[in-house]
A protein has these predicted regions:
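ATP-binding N-terminal substructure of ATP-dependent carboxylate-amine bond-forming enzymes
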Residues: 1-100
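Active-site nucleotide/adenylate-binding loops and adjacent lid/helix of ATP-dependent enzymes
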Residues: 107-189, 201-203, 231, 235
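A short acidic/small-residue loop/turn micro-motif
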Residues: 214-215, 269-271
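Flexible, glycine/charged-enriched surface loops at secondary-structure junctions
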Residues: 249-253
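ATP-dependent carboxylate-activation loops
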Residues: 226-227, 270-275
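Short, charged, surface-exposed secondary-structure boundary motifs
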Residues: 40-42, 57-60, 108-112, 160-163, ...
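Phosphate-binding site of ATP-dependent enzymes
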Residues: 163-240, 244-245, 255-256, 260-262
Length: 275
């Protein structure tokens, strides 16, 4: 039997349904959430109401569920929980459950945008320039290396929260003066794409890639899109995934500008386009 535990299922009904279809007759899907009003939990074979992720004892409760329900693999649909799974990988393995996330190092890089920028540069993958130091950014502008507008955003975070576009130095100064932990990112003036990539947890080999051309966004997630296929892009994604050492499920944001591909961000989970 293959039993899958989906944490923080929320409103992601289809994700739960897809797992049930794939496991029909082979295992069960168990879902959790902190609210009895989360519709997706009622799509699962079984569900368990749990404390909020921030409450003491949350991890112990999840481990208890894994042990009692003989869970084969566990995954989460929300960002704050991914680090919890990755950081406690050994504890899950001790009860016979595989956390379906990349290793803690890769998860940490994904959640820190400047770290991802540096990783892309080090591995030779094109990406928009990022700056933590305003003086370094202003110097680059003066040298004609990039132009306004630019994005000012938190160096860590998700769901496109607190992202602002700055058209000039005055706006950059104002935004960066309001709070700490911000970075300046080059504006990528091109078509945005999203890639859902599935990587074997053991071998690290890419199992499947699905690319979508983004047509409409909602709170940083894809709302409307159309499928897209290009061998050059698929080869780039496969190379990137292997060199980064990813495992499990990842969602890559990319831009196409004048026929060239740029990697923007990586989310180590199902993309928001999955309802």
């Amino acid at each position: 039997m293959i039993n899958i535990l989906i944490l923080s299922a929320g409103t992601r009904d289809k994700v739960v349904q897809y797992f049930k279809e794939a496991l029909a007759g082979k295992g069960k899907v168990i879902a959790t959430d902190c609210s009895p009003y989360a519709p997706a939990i009622y799509e699962a074979d079984e569900y368990v109401l749990v404390p909020r992720i921030t409450e003491p004892g949350y991890l112990d409760k999840i481990l208890e569920i894994c042990r009692e329900k003989q869970i084969t693999g566990v995954l989460s649909l929300i960002d704050p929980e991914l680090s919890l799974l990755a950081d406690n990988k050994e504890r899950f393995l001790e009860v016979g459950t595989v956390p379906i996330v990349p290793d803690a190092k890769q998860v940490d890089i994904c959640f820190h945008k400047y770290a991802m920028y540096e990783a892309c540069k080090a591995l030779g993958f094109a990406t928009g320039r990022c700056f933590l130091d305003r003086k370094e950014f202003y110097h680059a502008v003066e040298n004609g290396e990039l132009t306004y507008p630019v994005f000012v955003k938190p160096e860590s975070g998700s769901a496109s929260l607190d992202i602002h576009m700055a058209q000039d130095q005055e706006t950059v100064e104002f935004l960066c003066g309001r709070e700490d932990g911000l970075m300046i990112q080059e504006f990528m003036n091109g078509q945005e794409y999203g890639a859902d990539v599935y990587i074997d947890m053991l071998s690290g080999e890419v199992v499947s890639i699905f690319v979508k051309k983004k047509l409409k966004m909602r709170a940083g997630e894809t709302d409307k899109a159309e499928s897209f296929q290009e061998e050059k892009l698929f080869a780039l994604i496969t190379d990137f995934v292997k060199k980064m050492g990813f495992r499990g499920i990842i969602d890559i944001d990319l831009f196409e500008i004048d026929g060239n591909w740029y990697i923007s961000e990586v989310n180590p989970r199902f993309g928001g386009g999955y309802p």
